[in-house]
Amino acid sequence: MIIESISGNIHDLPGEDLEDVHVESVVLPLADLTKRIQRVRSDHGTELGIRLAPGAPDLREGDILLRNERGIVVVRLEPTDVLVIAPVTVREMGVVAHNLGNRHLPAQFFGPAEPFPGLEGHDGVMVIQYDHTAEHYLEHLGVRHARMERSMPVPFRHAEHTH
């Protein structure tokens, strides 16, 4: 079966809508959320082709690929190997952001309310895909950070820019 559009998101459905519903999952790595055309297989063996229109939003955790009388098939994210950076001072944040930005490493930012085990009490974090040279740099500077597996809410992307 070819999927050409998303049928909503499981996280937007009321709990009672999911009672007695057979739920299958398609586990995707973060990078595959941006792919418009791909072939996937659910954890129950259902094969699907995905062919989304150009300009369609990226896939995200919980997107419903298929909904029929047998149940639903949803997108689940494979955890990503990331470095979570929790600078203590504004100067430390500026130095790290400047140097990692010069390396064009895509980053995501989270506020103090977002929990990151091992970095409790942070004032905000910067998250990048794991890179051993970035980790070495952070260790050299003595910046508080942790390597962890995490399901990221959106894919890492490079921002367009010019020099």
Swiss-Prot record:
GO molecular function term, any single one: nickel cation binding
Keyword Chaperone: yes
GO biological process: protein folding
Keywords of the record: Chaperone, Cytoplasm, Nickel, Nickel insertion
Subcellular location(s) of the protein: Cytoplasm
SMART domains per record: UreE_N
Chief place where the protein resides: cytoplasm
InterPro entries: UreE, UreE_N, UreE_N_sf
GO cellular component, one term: cytoplasm
Coiled-coil boundaries: none
Family assignment from sequence similarity: Belongs to the UreE family.
NCBIfam families membership: PRK13261.2-3 (NF009757)
The protein's name: Urease accessory protein UreE
Species for this entry: Actinomyces naeslundii
The encoding gene: ureE
